[in-house]
Each structure stands twice: as C-alpha cells, then as structure tokens.
C-alpha cells in the first residue's frame, strides 16, 4: 500500500491531435504491431521510424552499415525530419530534444520475458541479414552463445541491462554505454526513471487485458489487431535446452539485468491493471509462461 501511495500516478493526459505523437518503442515489447496499427490508422503524411545511438553502445563503425540500415539510424538530431508521427527505438531524450511539442507514448513489458525474447529473437537472425550491419553483427551474434554470455558481455549492455530505464534516462553519466549499471546508483536512477515515465502523455503495460481498447479510446481510432515481428523457432543448428541454461548464476544475472525495469513495470502495472491483482504473482506467471514459450522455440 505504501508503495502504491508513494510512486507516481502515471495519469494519462488527453490526446491533442494538433501535436505530434512520439512513441518510445522499447525493443521486444510487441510494439511493432502497435506502432504499425497506429500508423495505418492515423494515416499521417510525415512519419519517422528508426533508432538512435542508445542501442549501439560505443559502436562507431557506421560506415559498414548498408544503405537501408543507415537510413534508419539517427545519430544527428538535425537530420531527423519534421513529422507528425515518430516511432522507433528512440530514447526519451532524442524524442523530446527533436520534437519538444510532441506527446510521448510508451509501453512496458514484464522485463525478464522481454529479455528472453530479445535473446531468442537475435539468435534467429540469419547471416544474410546480419551482413547488412557490418561489424555490429559480432555483437548480435553474442546471442548464439550461452544465455550467460549474452548477459555478461558489456558491448551489448546497452540492450541487455535494464533497457527501459536506459531509454528513459540516456544519455546519463550514471549509465555507461558499454558497462553495466552500478547497483549503488539504483535508487537515484529508479527515482528519475519513474519521474520521466510519469511525464509521458500515455503509458501502459502490454499485459493489461484492456491494453488495445484503452489505446484505441485514447487515440480516438479503432486500432487493428495485429501480431507482427514475432520471435521465430530457432534455427536447428542453434537449438539448445533452456532448462540447462537457467542455472543459479544465470537466473541471478537475469534478475540483475532486469532489477530496475522490473520495478518500473510493477509500478506502472499497479496503476493500469484491474484493482485486486497481485503484481508479484502476475509477474511469476508471466515469466513462467515466457520460459515455457522460449524453451519450446529453442528446444532441439
């Protein structure tokens, strides 16, 4: 009860159709289906999609990217065109700096299930696709090793370590681009991340049974129901037993890489889910289902 009373209320603001809409899409939150539905429904003439430098850590060999990939990466805010709809893996800072008048929207997913999905999704990427990313493919290929290796390589801490928190706060000296977050900074980072999330015009957890209806009502449109960009069955040569991956150390790493995001998600879930729901029980249910799902996709 005390936690409920002391955390932000995350009260959604009314939609202002005169203002741009900017979506902070956290990877693997089922956001591709949502943003595509929003795009198709709003039918705006100016739209921006892509990513910023947050997801690339300290990587700087951008000249190796093929042209199609390069067009989706915005390292210079001045090169982001004016738009009414901005959707992508952009940090909050990128969105507010380039589109200060935009209403911000984001969704959170239970973070351990999101992180497992991220690992398996990368593991499914073909060599042909990865070649378009130049030397960054070496970082994505870390997903082809053990889950423990994926969770401990600092080159991809920018995507594996409390990603939602990073997207809310980046750039921030307390968060390294190629290092894991120091637990001694957790309290101040969580406080600031909660306050940033509280300032969004609209936010929700994707596990909300009324997620689709509530978002449609806020946007004053009927969003189509889609299921795009799902995580596929892992290629045969990369299949492993997930139960053997989840030893005590790896389970600790999963919890540690999600510790801040888990508190963000739980705080928002308490405000969004029907009253009476037990958040810890729901979180366990979601993670157990995720382990079963991704275990099946990985199974030899």
Name each model-derived stretch.
Residues 24-34:
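Glycine-rich phosphate-binding P-loop
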Residues 32-34, 114, 265:
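General alpha-helical segment detector with a strong preference for membrane-spanning helices
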Residues 1-19, 282-300:
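Juxtamembrane luminal stem/stalk of type II transmembrane Golgi/ER carbohydrate-processing enzymes
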Residues 89-90, 177, 207, 224-296:
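PAPS-dependent sulfotransferase catalytic core
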Residues 50-52:
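Short beta-strand-centered segment that lines the nucleotide-binding/catalytic pocket of NTP-utilizing
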Residues 4-9, 55-107, 113-227:
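PAPS-dependent sulfotransferase catalytic domain
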Residues 33-47:
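A conserved segment at the C-terminal end of the G1
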